[in-house]
Amino acid sequence: MVGRRRSTGASVAGIGTRALRVLARREVSEAGLRAALGRAGLDQATVEAEVEAARALGVLDDARSVEVRARRLVEGRALGEAGMRRRLLESGYPPALVERALRDVIAEAQWDERSVAEELVRARAVPPDARGRARLARLLLSRGFQSELVEDLLWKGGPPSG
């Protein structure tokens, strides 16, 4: 076709467009962006150029992004603190940023791990048998709730009333 050029990503004007597409879908870490661009088949030099362009435009900022993701996890009320930490670290955020974001967001939201775990236990109704309790315990532990808390809710203190 005359008048149409196929984008190869090599033109200066096209640099950053792939990164912007990834970032438009959701908040991602710099490491997550690099991985997504690599999976798209871009060579290392192009990945670096895309990341630099995104940084220069101000749309790639791990400190801002990890805080947004931490806030969503806290508001989702489905994970314990360790589960939220694991999720953020697996997304490629640096440990120091994850710790700071979780600390700040948890304090701001006055989030309490016990109350979140109690909500989840109430929603599922604690099974009367040991096998059912063990299944519920595995679910809570897999979501990053503290083992002492799970033990207290399911065996020691009994199910929360509500």
Predicted regions and their residues:
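An alpha-helical, amphipathic repeat domain used for nucleic-acid recognition
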Residues: 1-162
